[in-house]
């Protein structure tokens, strides 16, 4: 284990929830690919990774189970979904509008909806960073990709 290698090398979503729509599955695949390519992930009190992250929903709570690359347990963090519910609901509503707009709207309408979608996504990402504070240090881009995955899990669940 390389000391100070604070990054994710693998991210897995709980498969027991099942699959979702092709649009949502595409978002999941892109978020995982981008997350593995570039991220900052520093569990508090640990010397360094890289890390494997398993994200799941258990009893309506968000669970981040962290292991080292060689599968040694690092920590598990359980977060309430309550601070995310409104943001996720708003995000899903605007995503539905966005996917509809892609099929039938003008570029300026699509851009306006996309700006709103990104704004709500940023709010969710900041909320996730705040909830992880003191547990896992992440940069904003990492939080954005993780928030996408939280939404995918929530959508399936």
Curated annotation (Swiss-Prot):
Q: Which residues cross the membrane?
A: none
Name the InterPro entries on file: UCP032146 (IPR008321)
Which Pfam families does the protein's record reference? UPF0262 (PF06793)
Q: NCBIfam families, from UniProt?
A: PRK02853.1
Q: Which family does it belong to?
A: Belongs to the UPF0262 family.
- Name by which UniProt lists this protein: UPF0262 protein Atu0536
């Amino acid at each position: 284990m390389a000391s100070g290698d604070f990054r994710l090398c693998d991210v897995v979503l709980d498969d027991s929830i099942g699959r979702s729509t092709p649009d949502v599955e595409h978002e999941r695949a892109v978020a995982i690919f981008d997350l593995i390519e570039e991220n900052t992930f520093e569990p508090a009190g640990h010397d360094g990774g890289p890390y494997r992250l398993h994200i799941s929903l258990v009893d309506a709570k968000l669970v981040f189970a962290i292991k080292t690359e060689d599968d040694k347990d690092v920590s598990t963090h359980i977060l309430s979904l309550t601070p995310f519910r409104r943001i996720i609901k708003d995000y899903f509503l605007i995503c539905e509008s966005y996917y509809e707009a892609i099929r039938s709207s003008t570029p300026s309408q699509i851009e306006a909806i996309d700006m709103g979608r990104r704004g709500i996504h940023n709010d969710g990402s900041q909320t996730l960073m705040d909830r992880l504070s003191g547990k896992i240090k992440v940069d904003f881009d990492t939080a954005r990709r993780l928030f996408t995955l939280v939404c995918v899990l929530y959508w399936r669940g």
